[in-house]
Amino acid sequence: MKDAPLQIHVLLGLAITALVQAGDKKVDCPQLCTCEIRPWFTPRSIYMEASTVDCNDLGLLNFPARLPADTQILLLQTNNIARIEHSTDFPVNLTGLDLSQNNLSSVTNINVQKMSQLLSVYLEENKLTELPEKCLYGLSNLQELYVNHNLLSAISPGAFVGLHNLLRLHLNSNRLQMINSKWFEALPNLEILMLGDNPILRIKDMNFQPLLKLRSLVIAGINLTEVPDDALVGLENLESISFYDNRLNKVPQVALQKAVNLKFLDLNKNPINRIRRGDFSNMLHLKELGINNMPELVSIDSLAVDNLPDLRKIEATNNPRLSYIHPNAFFRLPKLESLMLNSNALSALYHGTIESLPNLKEISIHSNPIRCDCVIRWINMNKTNIRFMEPDSLFCVDPPEFQGQNVRQVHFRDMMEICLPLIAPESFPSILDVEADSYVSLHCRATAEPQPEIYWITPSGKRLLPNTLREKFYVHSEGTLDIRGITPKEGGLYTCIATNLVGADLKSIMIKVGGFVPQDNNGSLNIKIRDIRANSVLVSWKANSKILKSSVKWTAFVKTEDSQAAQSARIPSDVKVYNLTHLKPSTEYKICIDIPTIYQKSRKQCVNVTTKSLEHDGKENGKSHTVFVACVGGLLGIIGVMCLFGCVSQEGNCENEHSYTVNHCHKPTLAFSELYPPLINLWESSKEKPASLEVKATAIGVPTSMS
C-alpha cells in the first residue's frame, strides 16, 4: 500500500508528459490543416503508415511557416502558392510533396537543398515554363517527378542532372516541341516516361537510347505521322508503349521490331487504313494488342498478325469502317484467348479465322452489321466451344428475311453454303477530291463463299487485275488500288468489282483531281455486229468517255411486232462484247445499248440486225463442227506427242483484245445467266411483265488479263 501513492504519481507524470507532447504537436500543425497518420504507397508500391500534413484546397498564398518535425507527407494541392521561402525549416524525413494546382511559375522558386529524402514530387497543373540546368539537383533520392499539365516549352539538356534514382517522369500535356536524348543521360534508372499531349510532331532515331531500363513509354496525342525505324533502339527492357491518338497512317512495323521485349502495344485512335501483311509479326513477348477507335481502318489483311507465341488478347473494336478480316489474318497465335471485334462494320467473320486460333476462349462480334449467309453460318453449326460475349446484341442486318433476328437463332440450314460477294459500303467513299500529283489508295474488300476475286475498272474502261502494275496503277491481291502521282487525266469514275462463281458485286467512286470533275464530252458510242446466227447475235461496243457508270443495259426489240416490251440485261461496263441468245431465226431486231453517266444522263445507240435462217445457220454450224473436230483432233495429237516426252501441256487462254470474245474451237458458249444468275437479278431493276422475247446474256470467254 505504501507504493500506491508512488505509482499514482508516476502515472500522473506520464499522462502529463503525453499531454504536453500532444499539445506541442498540435501547436506545430499549421492552422486549418489536418495532421494525422495515413496509409501511403512509395513509388515502389511499398505500403507504409506515414505522418501526413493535409493542407489541400485552403487557398493558401504562402508555404506553411512551421511543420511537425516528423512530417513525411505534405499535401498542398489546390492553393495559390507561387514560391517556397522557408525551405530551411523542412522536416528532414519529408518523403512526399504535393504542390499540384498552384501558381508556381519557376522551379528556381523552390529551394530543394534541404529535401534530400524526397521520393515523390508533384508539380502538375502549375505555370512552369521551363526546366533549367540542374534545377532539382538536391533531390538525389527522388523516384517520382510529375511536371505534367504545365506550360513547359523548354527543358535544358542537363535539367535532370542529379536525379539518377528517378523511376517515373511525367512530362505530358505541356508545350514541348522536341525530344532531346540528352535529357535522359542523367536518368539511367528511369522506368516510366510520359510524353503525351505535347506538340512534338516528330521523334528522331535514338531519341530514347540512354533509357536502358525503361519499361513503359507513353507518347500519346503528339500528332505523330510516322515513327523512324530506329526510334526505339536501346529500349531492350521496354514492355509497354502507347501511340494512342496520333496521326499514324500505317503500323510502324520496323520500329516496333527493335523493342524486342514488348508486351503491351497501344495503337488506338490512329488513322491507320489497313493492317498489312507482317505488321505484327515475330514479336515473341507481346501479350496484348490494341487497335481500337481507328476511323480509317478498313481491313486486316492476310498474315497481318503472325507468329506472336505469347499473345493473349486482341482488341479491334469501335472501328467504323473495319469491314473485312482475311481468313488468314491471325496466324500462329497459339495462346490467344480473347478476340474483341465488336462495334465495327463487319458483315461476316470467316470460320477459317477462328479455326486458326486453337486456344481461343471468347470472342466479341456484337454490334456489327452481320449478313446472315454462308460466311457466318458456322456460328450455328455447333463446331466451336468459344464463348460469344453479349450474344443478345448479335443481330442479322441482311438478307431481308432475317433482318432483326438474333444470329444465334437462325438455323444454319437456312443459310446458303455459297453466296454472292458483298463489298462493304464503308470500304471507300463515293466521291474523293485529291490534289494533283498525290498518292491515292482505294481499299476494296468483299466477303463471300467461295472467296471472291477483286479487280478494278478505270474511267477509260481499262481492267486492272490484282498483282499487276500498269502505268500509274497497281492493284494489290487484297483489292487495294494504288494510283501514283494522279493528274486530272486520271480523274473520273473508278469501279471495284468482286466476283466468284455465284455472282458479283460492285462499288464505284468518283475521283476529282484539284476539284476538277470530268465533263461529258459527248464522246462517241459505237456498236459493231461481230457475229450473226439463227438464234444469237454477238455485238460489241466502244465508248470514248470517262464518266460512264459501271453497268451497261442491252435491250432487243422485235421490229415486226407492235409490242415494244423487251427483256434487258445489265453487265459491267468493262464487258465490251455481248452475246444475245434465244433469238428467233429470220427475225429483224433492234438492239440498243444504254450506258448511264454520272450526271444522270445516258448514252444510247441502236442497230438493226436480222437473224439468219435455220437452214443457213445449219450449214455454217456444219462447217463449224468440222472445224471444231479438226481443232480437237489436232490438239489431241499435240498433247499425245508432248506426253511421249513426259511434258504437261496446259491450254492457254483465248482472250482477244480486252473483252469477252468468241472462240469456236476451244470454248463453248456459256449462258451468262447460268454463270452469274444472281448478278443479272441483282442489277435488273425493271418490273415489266415477261415479254415474248427472252434475251439472255452469254459469256463467251472469261478474261484472264487486264483490258
UniProtKB/Swiss-Prot annotation:
Sorted alphabetically, the keyword list is: Disulfide bond, Glycoprotein, Immunoglobulin domain, Leucine-rich repeat, Membrane, Repeat, Signal, Transmembrane, Transmembrane helix
- The chain positions of domain LRRCT read 368-421
Domain Fibronectin type-III: residue ranges: 523-614
Gene3D superfamilies according to UniProt: Immunoglobulins, Ribonuclease Inhibitor
Family annotation (SUPFAM superfamilies): Fibronectin type III (SSF49265), Immunoglobulin (SSF48726), L domain-like (SSF52058)
User: The Ig-like C2-type domain covers which part of the protein?
Assistant: 421-514
**Positions in the Extracellular compartment:** 23-626
Give the membrane topology: Single-pass type I membrane protein
Disulfide-bonded cysteines: 444-496
Q: Which residues are glycosylated?
A: 93, 103, 223, 382, 522, 579, 608
Per its record, how is this protein called by name?
Answer: Leucine-rich repeat neuronal protein 3
Q: Which organism is it from?
A: Rattus norvegicus (Rat)
